[in-house]
Amino acid sequence: MGDNLMDKVTAFGERLKIGGSEVSNKISAGVSSMSFKVKELFQGPNPTDKIVEDATTENLEEPDWDMNLEICDMINQETINSVELIRGIKKRIMMKQPRIQYLALVLLETCVKNCEKAFSEVAAERVLDEMVKLIDDPQTVVNNRNKALMLIEAWGESTSELRYLPVFEETYKSLKARGIRFPGRDNESLAPIFTPARSTPAPELNADLPQHVHEPAHIQYDVPVRSFTAEQTKEAFDIARNSIELLSTVLSSSPQHDALQDDLTTTLVQQCRQSQTTVQRIIETAGENEALLFEALNVNDELVKTLSKYEEMNKPSAPLTSHEPAMIPVAEEPDDSPIHGREESLVRKSSGVRGGFHGGGGSGDDMMDDLDEMIFGKKNGCDSSTNPDHDPKKEQSSSKNDDLIRF
């Protein structure tokens, strides 16, 4: 009895020990995660965070487009870390001040429309999760909620451009499955990821913006796209043409298998695709400059042809199948045709063949044999001199008696 009680107490103590260890591990993990978040929120801002704060400060009545586009240039020129910048925008979206949230969403939209790698950073930093939380938060103002919904809808429906990042489409479909109603998108939201430039210059655009500030509860700003200078355009065209020439040379001069597996080919293909994106943006921002538009379209056509040739060579080759040579149908003449009959009559046949063919008829064959003997000195296809039954005396007597051919 005492031993059983001790065993139960020991087992219960072990369970308490194991349970306490698990609880301790969970608490440690939770504290570590919380300390990381607290450190992230309260540590001193780095230079990138300061840039984001200046662009989304609550003192701004409207987006500072010059600053936003300058930030995009800094990302493209890699003078600032794009990961830290997107992370800083995410922090501003998480804040509860409506104006800061809205300006952060506008800055985010500007970056993804003007920076090629911004979408990858948005997906990696889980910015969409914070946007969904903003949408689900009942304290979020309607304007900010609609802005987040419009961005998610535009990205979710851009399956061709963002097919390599499925998180955008999945987030959009998840909200639709929950019955979330998306607001009607304006023309700017319906445009492609890289929106065309407006016909009005930037100063006039900013001058018109205060008129829209007084519109009720649905403030929308057009996101401008940075245009290219003459030097940038020339450099982009030169890079594109050099890439086209090199890739075409590699594909034409090397064996197909070696060309496709070569690292140089892969690098050139990537460079051509990057150049194609840049040239397409030049086309979108060309405006009324017909000479620039014409040159950009020609370069884009050359890029498309070269990349299409690479894709065609990269396709798996179909198994070779043996094909029979093509036969030309020829109509055959029936045996009883007049032509066949005339040709048949021109061929001399032996008596045995003639006899067999005509069923062993007699008089006609004898007549032909006699005619052969008179003309050729042969009978039944044999020379009379070589015939063992040949008798010259009988032949002379026969020739005297038969002056004419008997039928």
Curated annotation (Swiss-Prot):
Gene Ontology biological process terms from the UniProt entry: protein transport to vacuole involved in ubiquitin-dependent protein catabolic process via the multivesicular body sorting pathway
Amino acid composition bias (Basic and acidic residues), ranges on this chain: 337-347, 388-407
Gene Ontology MF terms: phosphatidylinositol binding; ubiquitin binding
CDD domains, sorted: GAT_GGA-like_plant, VHS
Domain GAT: 228-315
Predominant place of localization: membrane
Keyword terms, alphabetized: Acetylation, Membrane, Phosphoprotein, Protein transport, Transport
Cell location: Membrane
Compositional bias ranges of the Gly residues kind: 353-364
Superkingdom, natural source: Eukaryota
UniProt keyword annotation of Acetylation present: yes
Annotated membrane topology: Peripheral membrane protein
Modified-residue entries (N-acetylglycine), positions: 2
Record's function text: Might contribute to the loading of the ESCRT machinery.
Protein name: TOM1-like protein 1
Species for this entry: Arabidopsis thaliana
